[in-house]
Amino acid sequence: MDKMTDDELRAFREQKVTELKHRAHEVRSEQVADGAIYPRIFFCTVYYTPKESGFTAERGFDATPITAPGLHARKYPRDFLLAVKKEGFGRINEAVDSRKYIRWMGDHRYAFADAPVGRRGEVLVPRRSCAISSRNKFLRQHARLKIKSQTVNEETGSDEWFVCDTGAGVHPLQIDLYWGEDEPRGAIGRQRARPHGTWMEYAFEVEVTVER
């Protein structure tokens, strides 16, 4: 996948998601002693907390200092604020009133924050917390998941996850895994949305057990 162009990856994703949709209509969960197993109807992605330190002009980013409502006239690199808008939170170089993060509030506003948190205020735990869509018909908030996937397990080092977050752009069959704090992989195309510490973009062959 890493060698695909952005357009090729987008087409590949759409094809795979279409296959998952069909499978989700046909496959039922398997009830076992530990919980319920869903065989290959979900796909996994990663999201992260971008660090301001990675958004420099030397790396090709638009580092023009700008401010926005909620930032009390403090200025940050333009591309960093765009990344915070997409990911939800960002780690700043210098704390403001002991707060080391900013968060996207919607409606063009940001706010300073103590930590990246999930839907109900739980602090996100790297390689443990994950997000699902509010339209997911199979999983619920606060569910504990065991994800069996070579890609997920090798790239994140974890197979146990806790649902505590959501996102407007998350697909109903998507499980978005929280990577943690990191600098972006690069300034071009989809590299902007990828943490530097992993090559993972998508994992489609996943088996999910919802633990009791």
Residue ranges, per PLM feature:
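Short, low-complexity, charged amphipathic interaction modules
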Residues: 1-21
